């Protein structure tokens, strides 16, 4: 076997007959499988041991040679080689076909490769191959056309007319093989190239297609006649096994049935030929053989599929590769692994951030080999077998050993569905009793886990390297930030939020107000003994907290705070300011001066003067965590998070916040509001009956009335709510629920959607406290059911979107430090009409500048070129009034097969500059796909009938953008740059005409009458600007403008959809995806290169081809950029392994084989498929060959020395 980590590329070609013979270990002549009495394989049958190797290790078939010492001997009695039984997975056989047979992939695929090679229609081919017509191979001196078809009758007539032997015509695959042998590739290619110079229309398209196939054969060295088989390989028997079931019956792979039919028909054909049977019988047998081989290769591709028992179609070789259950996706990309287990999860509130609880019996099974090794090392048992028995008996001593073994040995926890990389994290195991895994409550958000019965899987990294990577790169305490937006993903939730909210509340006039304490301990003592309340405002000596960053003016004073806040601040990192107010000013600039007593001032006076602060809510805690991370990085942050969690749980327990029906308030003026609404609706209906409004207007007015009534109730609810009400506290703190839940409990449920999505006019007037009537209950079931079905559909859609995104971007890896490009991207805030969807500050953070940025007024240089823009710098730039900045962007990066560090910027998951080897493509795909389920499914109608455009939003719009489809409600765009001179309406055709005067000429655009205009007369418009509301069709924009403007447009559109749903995603992720959609060009004119016109190729390959020609002084080729949807882009990737494992497996492999494609294994997927370590992260070539050395022996290498990775050309290493 070849070592998988040594080879660098993998090629697929057509197999020549000699190649098939060289693979084969013998011919399979009989259809028999195994003998039903002896259960031994039959000689010369499909499981023959002579051909395929022994069924038992080191043992021949007759038993003369047993044991390993006879290795390599071929038995003289039975002819079987003594070797390992696993050769039955590798050795192939063959069948000598008595008549040539066409390969169905090349004849039936679209486009038919055989048809293109011979310039015959697939229909004609089918008639010849399946013996319905003769084809003229060599007309000799007769006036017959070569390749023309003759029916049986015409053939006989022509024979009589011209005499026997005057021309050659045959039928069946044999005829096709003769024709293919006669194809002169070089001559045909030259002819087609000539034809292309003049041809146009359909003729040109066909010529380009034929040229493509012929050129592929010419360059790859494959011969066209190999598309017809004379010899059929038989795959190894262990890949099509036959196993005995209980009860003596056998279960065999379908392939055995299919092979058996081929062999039967082939043998019968041989006998008929020997007997010189009549032509028609032989023909029929040849046709049946052809059909049998077709079924074996791809059952069901042509005609009715061959069925097994119970009319189930048999699974052919093609089906073994295809689809989710096929070889690629089931066994190569998704293997089951050893050392794993799964169990229900329960909450582990006492765990540290980096720990998880593992049940004892699970741990002993997972760590069995480690425990056994220790048992032997400690000499509790003499050998491994005895140690194993000890573990299985459950000896008392194994538990102490287990404790030792798992110390510092991280395990991985995974929850399905793994939507982003935070779905697998590493923890240190802690042994617990019970049978459920214990999970730290703060990592739940990353996993999207809850404890209502979720299950999780646990995996053990075995090797030292795997453990090191798990500990350093995957430990849960390291994953504070979410890779999609760089915001903390471990924010406290529910009880923890509630506890800290209650703790930081302030209240006037509670016991102990105005007391002054010398330090924290005294304050806590007073609180514990009932002298001071948590919420009462008290004084504390500032000097008792010397490590806090006080201003000089604040030292040696007394500060007014609450006992709760003293406890709250006690867990904060030392260098953070003392937090009094839940706002960013206090967090970043320090405690406000108004809380400090001047010498001799009365504390009660100050307390009375101060406003009562609102408590700290979930959002404020999130900000504190983000600030902590920014200042102190992961270790301190995770320790702080644990303290926050413990404090929150402790105080939410102490507070004893409960919910009863009496906690839901009654709104005093509900009846008045509802009566007023009824009255208004009555008036609207009256007006409608009088004909003063249309039915649509009435519907809109009625629904608006009820919506306003609901809002009025909500407003009243907020005005009258008691801040100490537990439900209000839960809602206000962000622990659970929101105002809409609250208003359904206390206000009214309001309008409901009918099953067709239209909103019903009858609202639900009751709330849950009063209870719903039967009719109201019935109405509300529509909405509930729609919610459930929508969610289910959305999950599947979103999952498929993620899969396509991952596939198209999986080979984008950070390959080098700096690509040295001189291009950049000009960015400004993204706006949607008047609203800003993404501010400039957000877009600048963590990117490198392309040019220096100057202050617009003073002209001072704020930041130089090629510098990293930090959060503070971004704020400084925006505050200076700069509106647009040119940055380094993924769009303009010049790195091949990836991106460079400077064009990418910081890694959002760590907040530091991205490292070479980071798989940014996969991260981008996950970041866009993971929030997919939060997007809505609906296609909105804009407020009734105002416009005729349906605006697609949510998930369908994202799919529309990434698949580069023509959008619904397309906008009209201008092709000329200039001014709008007039807009005239034409009532007869119900259209408007827009005239744009450019420098070169006048552009005239017809838009529908109802379309909303975006421009007015006198407006200046650029090329590609939208004249009407709606989405621009990106392919059209690409024709009118350039690649960069299309990329910018797509980026802005994706961001609009996500931001409108309140989901933040870093620009760079969208940039990576959009760049992949635009990485191909189509060759228009080949110039002096040997490219073919109409070929799709990578931009980098195209530039290379041109570079050589320009250097030698020739004419370079010209090309056009092509925008491809992500599905198409994945299938057009350079790696055939990646494309085949994605979709349309047979088509991809057919095409790759004809071209003799080489897969250079640059992406992640290809390497996973062949079982090689992936070329990202620590698997990159530059990191693979580093030998570990002791720190003092060598100077630490400067990181820039390691950063410039050459993108290697792939051949044998």
Curated annotation (Swiss-Prot):
One of the GO BP terms on file: DNA-templated transcription
Cofactor note: Binds 1 Mg(2+) ion per subunit. Binds 2 Zn(2+) ions per subunit.
Catalytic activity: RNA(n) + a ribonucleoside 5'-triphosphate = RNA(n+1) + diphosphate
Residues annotated to bind Zn(2+) 2: 819, 893, 900, 903
Cofactor(s) named in the record: Mg(2+); Zn(2+)
Keywords for the protein's UniProt record, in alphabetical order: DNA-directed RNA polymerase, Magnesium, Metal-binding, Nucleotidyltransferase, Transcription, Transferase, Zinc
Superkingdom field: Bacteria
Cellular component GO terms, alphabetical: DNA-directed RNA polymerase complex
Pfam families: RNA_pol_Rpb1_1, RNA_pol_Rpb1_2, RNA_pol_Rpb1_3, RNA_pol_Rpb1_4, RNA_pol_Rpb1_5
Disulfide bonds: none
CDD domains: RNAP_beta'_C, RNAP_beta'_N
Residues the record lists as binding Mg(2+): 450, 452, 454
A GO molecular-function descriptor: zinc ion binding
Entries under InterPro entries matching the protein: DNA-dir_RpoC_beta_prime (IPR045867), DNA-dir_RpoC_beta_prime_bact (IPR012754), RNA_pol_asu (IPR000722), RNA_pol_N (IPR006592), RNA_pol_Rpb1_1 (IPR007080), RNA_pol_Rpb1_3 (IPR007066), RNA_pol_Rpb1_3_sf (IPR042102), RNA_pol_Rpb1_4 (IPR007083)
EC number: 2.7.7.6
Binding-site positions, Zn(2+) 1: 60, 62, 75, 78
Subunit structure: The RNAP catalytic core consists of 2 alpha, 1 beta, 1 beta' and 1 omega subunit. When a sigma factor is associated with the core the holoenzyme is formed, which can initiate transcription.
Family from the record: Belongs to the RNA polymerase beta' chain family.
Record function comment: DNA-dependent RNA polymerase catalyzes the transcription of DNA into RNA using the four ribonucleoside triphosphates as substrates.
HAMAP family associated with the record: RNApol_bact_RpoC (MF_01322)
Name by which UniProt lists this protein: DNA-directed RNA polymerase subunit beta'
Gene: rpoC
């Amino acid at each position: 076997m070849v070592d998988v980590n040594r080879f660098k590329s993998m090629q697929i070609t057509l197999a020549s007959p000699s190649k098939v013979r060289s693979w084969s270990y013998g011919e399979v002549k009989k259809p028999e499988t195994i003998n039903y009495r002896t259960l031994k394989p039959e000689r010369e049958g499909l499981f023959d041991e002579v051909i395929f190797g022994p069924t038992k290790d080191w043992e021949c078939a007759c038993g003369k040679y047993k044991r390993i010492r006879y290795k390599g001997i071929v038995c003289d009695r039975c002819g079987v080689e003594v070797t390992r039984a696993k050769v039955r997975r590798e050795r192939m056989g063959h069948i000598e076909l008595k008549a040539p047979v066409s390969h169905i992939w090349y004849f039936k695929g679209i486009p038919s490769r055989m048809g293109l090679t011979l310039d015959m229609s697939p229909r004609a081919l089918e008639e010849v191959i399946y013996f319905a017509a003769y084809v003229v191979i060599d007309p000799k001196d007769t006036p017959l056309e070569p390749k023309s078809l003759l029916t049986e009758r015409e053939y006989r007539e022509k024979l009589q007319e011209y005499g026997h032997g005057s021309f050659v015509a045959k039928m069946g695959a044999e005829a096709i093989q003769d024709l293919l042998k006669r194809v002169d590739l070089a001559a045909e290619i030259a002819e087609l190239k000539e034809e292309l110079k003049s041809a146009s229309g359909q003729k040109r398209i066909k010529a380009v297609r034929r040229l493509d196939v012929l050129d592929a054969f010419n360059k790859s060295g494959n011969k066209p006649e190999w598309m017809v088989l004379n010899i059929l390989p038989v795959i190894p028997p262990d890949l099509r096994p036959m196993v005995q079931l209980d009860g003596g019956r056998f279960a065999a792979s379908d392939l055995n049935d299919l092979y058996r039919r081929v062999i039967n028909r082939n043998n019968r054909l041989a006998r008929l030929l020997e007997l010189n049977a009549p032509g028609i019988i032989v023909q029929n047998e040849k046709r049946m053989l052809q059909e049998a081989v077709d079924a074996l290769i791809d059952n069901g591709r042509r005609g009715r599929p061959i069925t097994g028992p119970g009319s189930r179609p048999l699974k052919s070789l093609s089906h073994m590769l295809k689809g989710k259950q096929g070889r690629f996706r089931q066994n190569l990309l998704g293997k089951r692994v050893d050392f794993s287990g799964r169990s229900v999860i329960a909450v582990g509130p006492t765990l540290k951030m980096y720990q998880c609880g593992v049940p004892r019996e699970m741990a002993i099974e997972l760590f069995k080999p480690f425990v056994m090794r220790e048992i032997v090392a400690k000499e509790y048992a003499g050998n491994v077998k005895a140690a194993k028995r000890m573990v299985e008996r459950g000896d008392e001593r194994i538990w102490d050993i287990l404790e030792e073994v798992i110390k510092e040995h991280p395990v991985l926890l995974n929850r399905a569905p793994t939507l982003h990389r935070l779905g697998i994290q590493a923890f240190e195991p802690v042994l617990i009793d019970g049978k459920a895994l214990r999970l730290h409550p703060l990592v739940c958000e990353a996993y999207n886990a809850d404890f209502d019965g979720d299950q999780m899987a646990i995996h053990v990294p075995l090797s030292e390297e795997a453990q090191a990577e798990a500990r350093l790169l995957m430990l849960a305490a390291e994953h504070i930030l979410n890779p999609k937006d760089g915001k903390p993903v471990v924010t406290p939730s529910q009880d923890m939020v509630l506890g800290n909210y209650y703790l930081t509340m302030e209240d006037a006039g509670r016991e102990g107000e105005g007391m002054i304490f010398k330090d924290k301990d005294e304050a806590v003592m007073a609180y514990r003994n009932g002298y001071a309340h948590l919420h009462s405002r008290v004084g504390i000596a500032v000097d008792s907290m010397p490590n806090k960053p006080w201003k000089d003016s604040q030292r040696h004073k007394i500060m007014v705070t609450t006992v709760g806040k003293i406890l709250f601040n006690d867990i904060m990192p030392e260098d953070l300011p003392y937090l009094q107010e839940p706002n960013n000013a206090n967090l970043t600039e320090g405690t406000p001066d108004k809380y400090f007593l001047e010498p001799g001032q009365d504390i009660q006076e100050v307390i009375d003067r101060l406003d009562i602060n609102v408590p700290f809510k979930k959002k404020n805690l999130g900000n504190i965590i983000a600030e902590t991370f920014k200042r102190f990085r992961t270790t301190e942050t995770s320790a702080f998070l644990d303290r926050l969690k413990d404090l929150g749980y402790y105080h939410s327990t102490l507070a004893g916040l409960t919910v009863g029906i009496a906690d839901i308030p009654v709104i005093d003026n509900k009846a008045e509001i509802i009566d007023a609404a009824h009255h208004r609706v009555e008036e609207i209906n009256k007006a409608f009956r009088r004909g003063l409004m249309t039915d649509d207007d009435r519907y809109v007015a009625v629904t608006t009335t009820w919506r306003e009534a609901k809002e009025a109730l909500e407003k009243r609810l907020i005005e009258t709510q008691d801040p100490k009400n537990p439900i209000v506290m839960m809602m206000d703190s962000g622990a659970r629920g929101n105002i809409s839940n609250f208003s359904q409990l206390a206000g009214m449920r309001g309008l409901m959607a009918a099953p067709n999505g239209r909103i019903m006019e009858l609202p639900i007037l009751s709330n849950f406290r009063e209870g719903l009537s039967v009719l109201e209950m019935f109405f509300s079931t529509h909405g509930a059911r729609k919610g459930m079905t929508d969610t289910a559909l959305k999950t599947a859609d979103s999952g498929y979107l993620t899969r396509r995104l991952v596939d198209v971007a999986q080979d984008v890896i950070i390959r080098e430090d700096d690509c040295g490009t001189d291009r950049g991207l000009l960015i400004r805030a993204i706006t949607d009409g008047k609203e800003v969807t993404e501010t400039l500050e957000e877009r600048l953070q963590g990117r490198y500048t392309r040019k220096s940025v100057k202050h617009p007024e003073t002209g001072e240089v704020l930041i130089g070129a090629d510098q990293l823009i930090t959060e503070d710098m971004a704020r400084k730039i925006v505050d200076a009034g700069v509106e647009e900045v040119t940055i380094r962007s993924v769009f303009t990066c010049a790195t091949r097969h990836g991106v460079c560090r400077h064009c990418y910027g910081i890694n959002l998951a760590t907040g530091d500059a991205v490292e070479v080897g980071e798989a940014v493509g996969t991260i981008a795909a996950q970041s866009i796909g993971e929030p997919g389920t939060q997007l809505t499914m609906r296609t909105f109608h804009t407020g009734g009938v105002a416009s005729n455009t349906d605006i697609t939003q949510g998930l369908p719009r994202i799919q529309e953008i990434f698949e580069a489809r023509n959008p619904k409600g397309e906008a009209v765009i201008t092709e000329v740059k200039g001014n709008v001179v007039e807009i005239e309406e034409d009532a007869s055709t119900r259209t408007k005409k827009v005239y744009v005067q450019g420098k070169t000429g006048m552009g005239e655009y017809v838009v529908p009458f109802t379309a909303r205009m975006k421009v007015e007369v006198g407006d200046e418009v650029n090329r590609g600007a939208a004249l009407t509301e709606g989405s621009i069709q990106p392919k059209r924009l690409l024709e009118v403008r350039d690649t960069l403007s299309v990329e910018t447009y797509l980026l802005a559109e994706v961001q609009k959809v996500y931001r409108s749903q309140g989901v933040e995603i870093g620009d760079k992720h969208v940039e990576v995806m959009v760049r992949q959609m635009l990485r191909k060009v189509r060759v228009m004119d080949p110039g002096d290169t040997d490219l073919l016109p109409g070929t799709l190729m990578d931009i980098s390959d195209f530039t290379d081809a041109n570079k050589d020609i320009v250097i030698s002084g020739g004419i370079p080729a010209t090309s056009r950029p092509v925008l491809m949807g992500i599905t198409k882009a994945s299938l057009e990737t350079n790696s055939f392994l990646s494309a085949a494992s994605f979709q349309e497996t047979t088509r991809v492999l057919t095409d790759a084989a004809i071209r003799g494609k080489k897969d250079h294994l640059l992406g992640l997927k290809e390497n996973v498929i062949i079982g090689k370590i992936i070329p990202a992260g620590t698997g990159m070539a530059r990191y693979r060959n580093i030998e570990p050395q002791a720190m003092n022996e060598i100077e630490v290498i400067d990181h820039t020395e390691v950063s410039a990775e050459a993108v290697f050309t792939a051949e044998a290493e």
